[in-house]
């Protein structure tokens, strides 16, 4: 993906916590590449117990790297003031990006109307259709390890994992109103590795670790 950024539109989803205490939730920022086939490919992420200013700083860092088409920020409960905070930071940093609106609103920010589990159930068909892909080269990264663990512990009755912060960033994908890039990006299944690989114009890059995804 990173070798072919021009073939994707990028989106950022978040779940920002308000405390760095050991008992607090994690702040999570997930970066996704969206291709012409409607697939979501995870490309980067941040997960840490920290004050919200550090998490917002991470959002801006990812924005500079990936130039996303939209950034999802939840505005419910204690997170209600995050949009204004980020808008003020845009002015201060002279860095501008689109804050995605919910499908039922024109205001910036994601406004959930159901509980966390119900929201995740709306994205579960994407997993079944193999439309959400996770990078094989990050399989040892703590961020992806946490995400895979949380996803694997979702049951029909609810979340069984201790934390659900990365799940929230996955659920937000259904609210991102994405648009597909004009460049076509095809993926080929490699039966030897069990991975989906991005077709690259440079044959030497086909099958490299950065091009390989698990679903």
Language-model-derived ranges and their functions:
Residues 112-129, 147-153:
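Short, surface-exposed amphipathic charged segments that create phosphate/polyanion-binding patches used
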């Amino acid at each position: 993906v990173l070798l072919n950024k021009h073939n994707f539109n990028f989106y950022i989803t978040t779940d920002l916590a308000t405390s760095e205490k050991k008992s607090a939730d994690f702040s999570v920022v997930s970066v996704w590449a969206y291709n012409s086939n409607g697939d979501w490919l995870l490309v980067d992420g941040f997960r840490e117990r920290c004050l919200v200013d550090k998490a917002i700083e991470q959002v801006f860092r990812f924005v500079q790297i990936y130039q996303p088409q939209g950034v999802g920020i939840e505005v419910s409960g204690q997170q209600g003031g995050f949009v204004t905070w980020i808008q003020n930071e845009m002015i201060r940093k002279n860095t501008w990006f689109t804050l995605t609106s919910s499908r039922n609103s024109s205001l910036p920010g994601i406004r959930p109307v159901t509980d966390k589990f119900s929201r995740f159930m709306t994205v579960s068909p994407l997993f079944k259709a193999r439309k959400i892909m996770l990078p094989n080269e990050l399989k040892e990264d703590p961020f992806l390890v946490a995400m895979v663990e949380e996803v694997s512990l979702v049951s029909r009755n609810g979340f069984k994992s201790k934390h659900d912060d990365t799940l929230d960033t996955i659920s937000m994908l259904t609210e991102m109103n994405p648009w597909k890039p004009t460049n076509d990006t095809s993926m080929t299944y490699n039966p030897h590795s069990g991975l989906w690989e991005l077709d690259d114009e440079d044959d030497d890059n086909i099958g490299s670790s950065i091009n390989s995804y698990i679903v």
